[in-house]
Amino acid sequence: MLWHLENRHTGATCFSKDEQKKALWDKAMEIAPENGVKVHHFLVNASAHRFFFVVEAPDYESLEATFGECKTLGEIEMTPVISW
């Protein structure tokens, strides 16, 4: 199943200078395969403080296991999608 994920945060809550917080994204990328999640695209619009992902995952629980800690870095919207 394909999913579109979007992380949104503000300039005031931006974590770009905080290596510990940035490491949460690295950890998510590392553990994704263990949770059955394949990251097809990880895209960033730095000036808008937005991260975009297209991932393949068997279910919502797999996404939570992969990206759950990243929810402390702003809002994450996880939407199931299909190819057009």
Language-model features: where?
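An amphipathic, aromatic/His-enriched active-site/gating alpha helix that lines ligand/cofactor pockets
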Residues: 26-27, 56-84
